[in-house]
Swiss-Prot record:
Binds 1 zinc ion per subunit. InterPro entries: aa-tRNA-synth_I_CS, aa-tRNA-synth_Ia, Anticodon_Ile_BEm, Ile-tRNA-ligase, Ile-tRNA-ligase_type1, Ile-tRNA_ligase, M/V/L/I-tRNA-synth_anticd-bd, Rossmann-like_a/b/a_fold. It comes from Ruegeria pomeroyi (strain ATCC 700808 / DSM 15171 / DSS-3). A motif ('HIGH' region) lies at residues 65-75. This is Isoleucine--tRNA ligase. It catalyses: tRNA(Ile) + L-isoleucine + ATP = L-isoleucyl-tRNA(Ile) + AMP + diphosphate. The lineage of its organism: Bacteria, Pseudomonadati, Pseudomonadota, Alphaproteobacteria, Rhodobacterales. It holds the Pfam family tRNA-synt_1. L-isoleucyl-5'-AMP binds at residue 608. IleRS has two distinct active sites: one for aminoacylation and one for editing. The misactivated valine is translocated from the active site to the editing site, which sterically excludes the correctly activated isoleucine. The single editing site contains two valyl binding pockets, one specific for each substrate (Val-AMP or Val-tRNA(Ile)). ATP binds at residue 652.
Length: 970
């Protein structure tokens, strides 16, 4: 603020209390943030927080990212939300611990090492398994180091010096021990059922390892001839499938009890057609016309002969029945029966059953006790047909690169040759793919190890149910809170409907299934599995000391079995555990076993993306219910996916990816963190260049607010403080009331993980209530008053605001609030992250005062709008040139205005409140009734110090100033 000067008038600028601060308006975050990271490490902020005594523990348990590749924007979102949860709870008085972790075993790393081998012309099979596992370990270690630094650069606090990793020896020992609890409690069994199988990676996959993409598939309509069916003998049941490769494994056809079927006779055919005149087809009536159209048959080329009761059909012959060279492979009669899962919404109204490749068919024949008659083993690990399968031996369902193999075409050609095909086509549909290789998967019956979710768990922990499923569902109902609440239903429905858990993988890099099976025994035999606590204890001790590699060492079987068992009577299992069992066991080796874990092995919060309802939330729940008897968490918090600015999924091919490292280099990590705080993370979020520009603009506005406070508090001391709010003007008491209200909002928001709500409330308060209103009004007092009560009150309020705004925003803007804090408290060990949210007295709340100020602000809006017209028309240059007359109809409002300095609030040199009706020419705002403003110029001279135009300017000891400024000059 400068004053006009003349030769006779002194320069008063140096007498003003102008803000003084070295806090720069330009943040320079990319360059400066690393300095604060170094400082925090030097002064040991995380460890010093752990030294605070008497605090209730709060534990957010980290869902481990995979130790493979640089961070993507989803990682940044995830870890930033976690960091805000941890920091805010620490500042609310908890001992908020955070142990970051990494998931290290599994297919993605194996795949990378195998890729390296392939480039060198080598195969994994050429290398000793322990040597291969060591290469996988080194690969994971390298990426852990890289990702750790990338996470730290985002300002994520935590025990980075001692994270948990699932390949640590202790972790591997506990994972094996948790598995052996399933072995001992009766839920582990070996079974054979269709599982999702990746021919490319040659292993079973969990649902969480599968993603769905559009795929073009062959679709065929195939004829099965009825036999032992009386008048229907020779008629053909038509099935439809999108997996022609499963036809050689067909064992049955099923129909729906409530579907109407008809017999259709072919009366004519076009030139190119696989139907013949006189053929009779059995079809669902609702689908018959569609099937005929697919077979190129016009409506006048077929007729409906009559109804068909499918229960009268005694059996079917396979289309390859009696085929020359078939060696009798398909010559037995195919079963034909009703099934609940058959519909007439698409296809033919019949379903071809290959129970080795479909779960519904498998379960149907399992429940009938007929599995032995219908299970085939035609498809090998690599997705090829067994070598001795007639016509198709050695044919691949998928090529080695994951493309279409030669199996489907070969099957279709053979069906054409034997007259078994009615129609063919292509269909584009959503199809499961391996999330790692991106290649399609198949369903394939293989021997696997399962954890039963419905067998009683014999561990004496039945408070929440006797089975894993019961315990999980009861935990969801009674023990776990969900944010957002929709996550509850999603997880519940998944657990309610899920099959048994496939634990085994046919891979090398993982924790092995540490169990032994008796040679010659069947999986259903009571002594099939060795259940011996002494053997288990030896395994655990060895893994603890040497890691899981010792399972593969020479003589391992003899070592673990000990002297009580003959090694040649037992087989050692070499499958490895599903990696979701690894991460699902973290409650044991992190929460239970670490000093910075939890007393009961249960976390306050698990927080991950919404895909983890079928991933980590899911596997952790199942695993803990099998060993703890209940869920391992009290709160499940879920975030959505990150999309580009147009709401499109990010992909390298579209060129719309946002890389966290690039954002940090351009804007700084605080801008990325602020984006997280501004968004509703519970839904899908959007990010892109324009969105980030908007975030940076919001940041600058907040930074400007903090800079103003720092400048105005440059020489503030305790002697300046006014302790009793009653001694303050109404405007300051209003700010105190708003602070108390906001303190409650902030604490409630942080406790409920509502960062968008916290940020929105604080940002609006800082920019609307403070910068655009309170600061704007009080600049005159702060700059021009002497040692007055109202200036002391304003600075007291600024100090109180400073301590609250910096701490409230510290969990979000970790770097900037540290910079702001150190500007006032630059001590060597000082940090905003070492303090708590200040206690804010509830007595500050004054709803009546808030209501009064709201009324005043409505009047002020009309005055400000009226003056803006005068400024626009160049009648005035500043509002201080005005002294308007404000006509207020409401007597209560007039009385309120009489109690305050309304001209100061409107930033005018004078203002008259009138009870007279407003004249016609008065300015009004339609949304604010009963207030009219008549513009008047201020009378008097311009004070050369405060710039107000007042009648008394020039009548005091100091030349060219008003009475207030004269008193300030002394």
């Amino acid at each position: 603020m400068c004053a006009d000067t003349t030769a006779e008038t002194p320069e008063y600028k140096d007498t003003l209390n102008l803000p003084k601060t070295d806090f720069p308006m330009r943040a320079g975050l990319p360059a400066r943030e690393p300095q604060w990271l170094e400082r925090w490490e030097k002064i040991g902020v995380y460890d010093r927080l752990r030294e605070k005594q008497g605090r209730a523990p709060f534990t957010l348990h980290d869902g481990p990212p995979y130790a493979n590749g640089h961070l993507h924007i989803g990682h940044a979102l995830n870890k930033t939300i976690k960091d805000m949860i941890v920091r805010s709870h620490q500042m609310m008085g908890f001992d908020a611990r955070y142990v970051p972790g990494w998931d290290c075993h599994g297919l993605p790393i194996e795949w990378k090492i195998e890729e390296q081998y392939r480039k060198k012309g080598k195969s994994k099979d050429d290398v000793n398994v322990v040597e291969f596992r060591q290469e996988c370990r080194r690969f994971a270690e390298g990426w852990i180091d890289i990702q750790r630094e990338e996470f730290k650069r985002l300002g994520i606090t935590g025990n980075w010096a001692d994270p948990y990793v699932t390949m640590d020896y202790h972790a591997e020992a506990v994972i094996a021990d948790e598995f052996m609890k399933f072995l001992m409690n009766g839920t582990l069994y070996q079974g054979s059922k269709p599982v999702m199988w990746s021919p490319i990676e040659q292993t079973a996959l969990a649902e969480a390892e599968v993603e769905y993409h559009d795929k073009e598939s062959f679709t065929i309509w195939v004829k099965f001839r009825a036999v032992n069916s009386g008048d229907l003998d020779g008629a053909q049941v038509v099935i439809w499938t999108t997996t022609p490769w499963t036809i050689p494994s067909n064992k049955a056809v099923v129909y729906g009890k409530d579907i109407a079927y008809g017999l259709y006779e072919i009366t004519g055919t076009p030139e190119e057609c696989w139907a013949s005149v006189g053929d009779k087809y059995i079809l669902a009536d609702k689908l018959a016309d569609d099937v005929m159209r697919r077979a190129r048959l016009d409506p006048d080329m077929y007729r409906r002969v009559g109804d068909v009761d499918p229960s009268q059909i005694g059996g079917l012959t396979h289309p390859l029945h009696g085929a020359e060279g078939g060696n009798g492979e398909w010559d037995d009669i195919r079963d034909f029966r009703a099934a609940e899962f058959v519909t007439d919404t698409e296809g033919t109204g019949f379903v071809h059953c290959a129970p080795s490749h479909g779960m519904e068919e498998f379960e149907l024949y399992r429940d009938l006790g007929m599995l032995e008659q219908v299970i085939t083993y035609n498809v090998m690990d690599d997705g090829s047909f067994r070598a001795d399968l007639p016509f198709f031996g050695g044919k691949y369902i998928l090529s080695r690169k994951g493309g279409e193999g030669d199996a489907n075409k070969t099957v279709i050609d053979k069906l054409v040759e034997v007259g078994g095909l009615l129609a063919r086509g292509k269909i584009k549909h959503s199809y499961p793919h391996s999330w790692r290789s991106k290649a399609p998967i198949i369903y394939r019956n293989t021997p696997q190890w399962f954890a039963s979710v419905d067998r009683p768990v014999n561990d004496g922990q039945d408070s929440y149910g006797k089975t894993i499923r019961e315990r999980a569902l009861t935990s969801i109902d009674q023990l776990v809170k969900f944010t957002p609440q929709t996550g509850r239903n999603r997880l519940y429905s998944m657990i309610e409907a899920r099959p048994d858990w496939v634990l085994s993988r046919q891979r090398a890099w993982g924790v092995p299934l540490t169990c032994f099976t008796r040679k010659g025994a069947l999986p259903t035999d009571a002594d099939f599995l060795l259940r011996d606590p002494a053997v288990n204890a030896r395994i655990f001790a060895a893994f603890e000391a040497e890691g899981a590699d010792c399972w593969y060492a020479e003589g391992a079987k003899e070592r673990f079995l000990g002297n009580d068992y003959k090694a040649d009577e037992w087989d050692q299992v070499f499958d490895v555990l599903d990696v979701w069992f690894d991460s699902g066991s973290t409650h044991a080796f992190v929460l239970r076993d670490r000093e910075d874990g939890t007393a009961d092995g249960i976390a306050d919060v698990y927080m991950e993306g919404t895909d983890q309802h079928r991933g980590w939330f899911h596997s952790s729940l199942l695993q803990a219910c099998g060993t703890l008897g209940r869920a391992p968490y009290r709160n499940v918090v879920t975030h959505g996916f990150t999309l580009d600015e147009k709401g499109m999924k990010m992909s390298k091919s579209l060129g719309n990816t946002i890389v966290p490292d690039e954002v940090v280099k351009q804007y700084g990590a605080d801008i990325l963190r602020l984006w997280v705080a501004q968004t509703d993370y519970t839904a899908d979020q959007r990010i892109g260049p324009e969105i980030l520009k908007g975030v940076a603009d919001s940041y600058r506005r907040l930074r400007n607010t903090m800079r103003f406070m720092l400048g105005s508090l440059s020489d503030f001391t305790e002697a300046d403080r006014i302790e009793d709010p009653a001694e303050m003007p109404p405007l300051e008491r209003w700010v105190l009331s708003r602070m108390a209200e906001l303190d409650e909002q902030v604490r409630k928001g942080y406790a409920g993980f509502d960062f968008q709500g916290v940020y929105s409330a604080v940002f609006n308060f800082a920019t609307v209530d403070l910068s655009a209103f309170y600061f704007d009004i009080r600049k005159d007092v702060l700059y021009c008053d002497g040692d007055t009560t109202r200036r002391r009150a304003a600075r007291t309020v600024l100090d109180l605001l400073f301590h609250r705004l910096t701490t409230w925003l510290a969990p979000i803007l970790v770097f900037t609030m540290e910079e702001v804090w150190l500007e006032r408290y630059p001590g060597e060990g000082s940090s905003v992250h070492l303090v708590d949210f200040p206690e804010t007295p509830a007595s500050w709340r004054n709803p009546q005062n808030e209501s009064n100020v709201a009324r005043v602000r409505r009047v002020r809006r009309v005055v400000t709008a009226a003056l803006e017209i005068q400024r626009r028309d160049k009648v005035i240059g500043s509002s201080l040139e005005a002294a308007p007359v404000v006509h207020v109809e409401d007597a209560e409002t007039r009385a309120l205005l009489a109690q305050i300095d309304i001209d100061d609030l409107c930033i005018t040199s004078g203002l008259t409140v009138s009870a007279d009706p407003a004249p016609a020419e008065a300015f009004r705002l339609p949304e604010i009734e009963g207030v009219g403003v008549v513009f008047e110029m201020a009378e008097g001279e311009k004070c050369q110090r405060c710039w107000k135009i007042l009648p008394d300017v020039g009548r005091h000891a100091h030349a060219g100033v008003c009475g207030r400024c004269d008193a300030a000059l002394g």
